[in-house]
């Protein structure tokens, strides 16, 4: 009797949870992404630019370069980073787990495809999408679905493709769209197939969600703190390290990066390591091409620079098996080399 009564009492209030989640998603994305990018698209169309390269004018002193880059970077992404942590924690307490299991929890290709589709409105950079992917994994979303969502956010970002068309040309945007779609779907599918789920990866899933552990605010507070502590400190540290190394990763000297296979490989690998805000690959490539970089290394960089980064891979170390993250990073680099290599042939 008691169990039946509690079940009946709980049922009528469940609708507000997903409703609140989607309200936060829509309001947050409108404020952080959709409305600013709408105006930025007109700027890109009129000026054929969306701003200066975030890598320009690196200080020779590594410590100063690290601080300068961290300041510029975090000023650009802090709103999206906060939104990512909020959504990554809310998805653990507001979205019924069986909803996620029916859509993104499947290990078949359907889960990967849905993860890709759900990523399109997000338009987040790889580091801001990482907390959301981590929250999804805590809800037992499959590796394929979570990886597709994580990579699809920056790689298939509709706003970035529009900016790219106006700034670099629609040929670049078309290549990024087609190659990016193949890259996201193929890598997520292969990682799902080749990497076995481990008990260590699945263990955290059961601890945050049950109603018996307290009310909404207490459970959300625990989820928020756990997600913040497991992602943000290492994120900040990794950004500082890469900020110090940027002058060596991306040489801007005239003619330094020519149209050769060596530079295709170098740019593909550097792009997998470095961290940038959303769409920052466009002015980076624009500046480097004006300095003499060839089309093939440019395409390699356009594929890998937004897709993954060392900080985002580290942020997801507790959400995915290590093998899954290594494979993802390696296959993104290979994808960049393939796209750049094909450009050398044609």
Curated annotation (Swiss-Prot):
It comes from the Bacteria. InterPro entries: DUF318. Keywords: Cell membrane, Membrane, Transmembrane, Transmembrane helix. The chain crosses the membrane at residues 12-32, 71-91, 113-133, 146-166, 167-187, 223-243, 260-280, 296-316, 326-346. It is found in: Cell membrane. It comes from Escherichia coli (strain K12). Signal peptide: none annotated. The keyword Kinase does not apply. It is a multi-pass membrane protein. This is UPF0718 protein YraQ. The keyword Membrane applies. Belongs to the UPF0718 family. GO terms for cellular component: plasma membrane. Coiled coil: none annotated. Pfam families: ArsP_1.
């Amino acid at each position: 009797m008691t169990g039946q009564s509690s079940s009946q009492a709980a049922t009528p209030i469940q609708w507000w949870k997903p409703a609140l989640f989607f309200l936060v998603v829509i309001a947050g994305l409108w404020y952080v992404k959709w409305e600013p990018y709408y105006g930025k698209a007109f700027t890109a169309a009129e000026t054929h630019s969306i701003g200066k390269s975030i890598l320009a004018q690196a200080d020779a002193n590594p410590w100063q370069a690290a601080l300068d880059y961290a300041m510029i970077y975090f000023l650009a992404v802090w709103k999206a980073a906060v939104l990512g942590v909020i959504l990554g924690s809310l998805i653990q307490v507001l979205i019924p787990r069986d909803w996620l299991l029916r859509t993104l929890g499947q290990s078949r290709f359907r889960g990967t495809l849905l993860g890709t589709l759900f990523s399109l409105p997000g338009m987040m950079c790889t580091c801001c999408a990482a907390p959301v992917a981590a929250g999804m994994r805590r809800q037992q979303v499959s590796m394929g679905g979570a990886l597709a969502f994580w990579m699809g956010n920056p790689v298939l970002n509709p706003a970035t493709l529009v900016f790219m068309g106006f700034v670099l040309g629609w040929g670049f945007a078309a290549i990024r769209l087609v190659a990016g779609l193949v890259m996201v779907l193929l890598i997520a599918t292969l990682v799902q197939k080749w990497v076995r789920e481990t008990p260590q990866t699945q263990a955290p899933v059961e601890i945050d969600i049950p109603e018996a552990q307290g009310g909404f605010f207490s459970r959300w507070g625990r989820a928020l703190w756990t997600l913040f502590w497991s992602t943000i400190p290492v994120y900040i540290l990794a950004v500082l390290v890469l900020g110090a190394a940027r002058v060596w990763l991306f040489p801007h000297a005239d003619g330094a990066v020519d149209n050769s296979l060596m530079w295709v490989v170098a740019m593909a690998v550097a792009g997998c390591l470095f961290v940038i805000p959303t769409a920052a690959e466009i002015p980076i490539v624009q500046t480097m091409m004006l300095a003499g970089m060839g089309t093939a290394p440019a395409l390699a960089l356009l594929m890998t620079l937004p897709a993954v980064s060392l900080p985002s891979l580290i942020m997801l170390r507790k959400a995915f098996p290590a093998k899954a993250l290594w494979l993802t990073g390696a296959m993104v680099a290979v994808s960049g080399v393939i796209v750049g290599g094909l450009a050398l042939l044609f």
